[in-house]
């Protein structure tokens, strides 16, 4: 037997956790990154380097119904949140960029005030505007109507100091909304007029074709009927008088042939008969009977009387119904065999098959 050595001491844990240090809250050292998606800008514009913070719950009492209301309600709020999170260096840069962009926008608005062709932006949300501007179809449509007007609202979201943007964006939004309503109404009117014109043209063409066919048939048929009425009537009456006896004999011959074919091909159709039902009842009565308790059981008709059977092995083999016994007798007579040579009785009186040694 080996001696057990001294038990090893438990290794001390080298990591000690300070509960007081864990309870302290970590101070935020990094700036919060902007979670709002920036809208697409013009190629000449610069992207603002301002990080916006997303508010968890909207301010009470304000409901966004259009882009203009969104701009006016969010101008003062974004200024306070941005000035707290952005350093003084970034503020100076953004002020310079905002002034440059304001001068550029003034030139753009002066040249594009006459063209108020813009896509519908009055009833859409910023996410819808972003999706619409990112799609190539909307870009094509905006380029065709006028470059610059749909993008006038973009710097207003990120540079609220410029007062020109708000006025220009409101005017462009109102005009674009009115113009879109007018264009939609005009399109509906044009579609209705086109559909009505097509229907009228189809109806007119059908009527013209029908009238031309009627005129042609009247002009050609009227003259022909006047000339050929008498001759046609005489020819038709003569043909009918000639064909009448031939058709009558043909019909009589067809009727006789059909009757003969039906008589020859008529075979007994299996149908319901009361005799068959009676035969079925008789066969069922031969196969089944009632016991002392009135229950329906299989009838065992054997030569020997019923006895108390103790040998269960020979119980199912000896008793054969009369119908089956008759069939067996017929088969044995066909093969010139006697029934006594096939079956015998055991000590208990049951009919069993004879086994010759």
UniProtKB/Swiss-Prot annotation:
Domain of life of the organism encoding this protein: Eukaryota
Pfam families according to UniProt: AIB
Region (Interaction with RBBP8/CtIP), start-end ranges: 281-357
Protein keywords: Chromosome, Cytoplasm, Cytoskeleton, DNA damage, DNA repair, DNA-binding, Nucleus, Phosphoprotein
Chain positions covered by the region annotation Interaction with AURKA: 189-357
Any one GO biological process: double-strand break repair via homologous recombination
Function, in words: DNA-binding protein that accumulates at DNA double-strand breaks (DSBs) following DNA damage and promotes DNA resection and homologous recombination. Serves as a sensor of DNA damage: binds DNA with a strong preference for DNA substrates that mimic structures generated at stalled replication forks, and anchors RBBP8/CtIP to DSB sites to promote DNA end resection and ensuing homologous recombination repair. Inhibits non-homologous end joining (NHEJ). Required for the dynamic movement of AURKA at the centrosomes and spindle apparatus during the cell cycle.
Assembly, per entry: Interacts (via C-terminus) with AURKA (via C-terminus). Interacts (via N-terminus) with NIN; this interaction blocks NIN phosphorylation by both AURKA and GSK3B. Identified in a complex with NIN and AURKA. Interacts with RBBP8/CtIP.
Protein's name according to its UniProt entry: Aurora kinase A- and ninein-interacting protein
Source species: Bos taurus (Bovine)
